[in-house]
Regions:
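Acidic catalytic loop of the alpha/beta-hydrolase fold
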Residues: 233-237
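Conserved HGGG/HGGXW glycine-rich cap/lid loop of the alpha/beta-hydrolase fold
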Residues: 17-71
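Catalytic active-site module of serine/aspartate enzymes centered on a nucleophile-bearing elbow/loop
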Residues: 252-283
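Gly/Ala-rich beta-loop-alpha elbow adjacent to hydrolase catalytic centers
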Residues: 102, 106, 110
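Short beta-strand/loop motif that positions the catalytic acidic residue
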Residues: 222, 228-230
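Conserved alpha/beta-hydrolase catalytic His-Asp/Glu region
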Residues: 156-220
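Flexible "cap/lid" loop of the alpha/beta hydrolase fold
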Residues: 115, 122-158
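Active-site loop/oxyanion-hole signature of alpha/beta-hydrolase fold enzymes
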Residues: 22, 53, 63-101, 274
Length: 283
């Protein structure tokens, strides 16, 4: 059986937000929550549709649209507390603790959850999160990365042409993954919710799109099993950021994937699914 968006689509009212999510797997299995990255047209499904079904053979898998994305509530930057939203989602679904898997922005949220709500987090898995504005040794240039420049441009012009450039900078194997079909899908998703785009750009103009960062110092007292996954060829967030996290989080390990861009869960889906399944099962 191949799971579809409609098969897995759900929604719930939490204390502060209406949250849409996709869910698969037994409700009796350990919970794994997949947190998507930013970008126009991004959703839980768009980021993790190649992972939901394989992981659901072992876990109760939940992939929410975070507030400000997809079918969840639009929010201004000041109201965009994704860690709080994730905890409220657990509460609404009756889940005491979950493994959190976060891509990019979702990885930043996952690290906030681990440091601010550690009692709700069993495992931490990140793919390509930033580590904050501290000086870097290996990252080329300064300021916004090449990928972030393309991403912000796509928010300003969410056309299929812009989305094509975005998918190209997100992936290493453009011929396989940066397809016209994916660009059209992301453009259609972005056009469906123009309020999400304007809220993102407004927040970006006022100090950056990430409303709240984790504390690097707080990572040093983390003792939650942590798996850091990063693409060696990531042009959005350089893998040096995960080296910084590895140095700070004592109970962590790093897997650096060769010939892989910012979407490790897409470009190396089979390996990613094996890594997540093994790590959550055996740690």
């Amino acid at each position: 059986m191949t799971l579809t968006y409609d098969d897995t689509s759900r929604s719930v009212k939490t204390e502060d937000w209406n949250i849409h999510y996709n869910e698969a797997g037994s409700q009796e299995a350990p919970a794994v929550v997949l947190l998507h990255g930013s970008g126009p047209g991004a959703t839980g499904w768009s980021n993790f549709k190649t992972n939901l079904e394989p992981l659901s053979a072992h876990f109760r898998v939940i992939a929410p649209d975070m507030p400000g994305w997809g079918e969840s509530d639009p929010v201004a930057k000041e109201e965009r507390d994704h860690a709080k939203a994730a905890v409220q989602l657990l509460d609404a679904l009756g889940i005491e603790k979950a493994a959190f898997v976060g891509n990019s922005m979702g990885g930043i949220t996952t690290l906030r959850l681990a440091t601010e709500y550690p009692e709700r987090v069993s495992h931490v898995i990140t793919m390509g999160p930033g580590s904050g504005p501290q000086p870097k040794l290996l990252t080329p240039g300064g300021g916004l990365s090449e990928g972030m420049k393309v991403l912000v441009a796509a928010y300003r012009d969410p056309s299929a042409e812009s989305m094509k450039r975005l998918t190209e900078v997100m992936t290493f194997d453009n011929a396989r993954f940066a397809t016209d079909e994916l660009a059209a899908e992301r453009a259609a998703g972005a056009a469906k919710h123009p309020e999400h785009l304007s809220n993102y750009l407004d927040g970006f103009a006022r100090g950056g799109a990430i409303a709240q960062w984790f504390s690097l110092d707080a990572l040093e007292s983390m003792d939650i099993p942590t798996l850091l996954i990063h693409g060696r060829d990531d042009r959005v967030v350089h893998f040096e950021n995960s080296l910084t996290l590895l140095a700070r989080i004592r109970n962590s390990r790093l897997v650096l994937l060769n010939q892989c861009g910012h979407w490790a869960q897409v470009e190396h889906a089979d390996e990613f699914n094996r890594l997540v399944t093994g790590f959550v099962t055996h740690n």
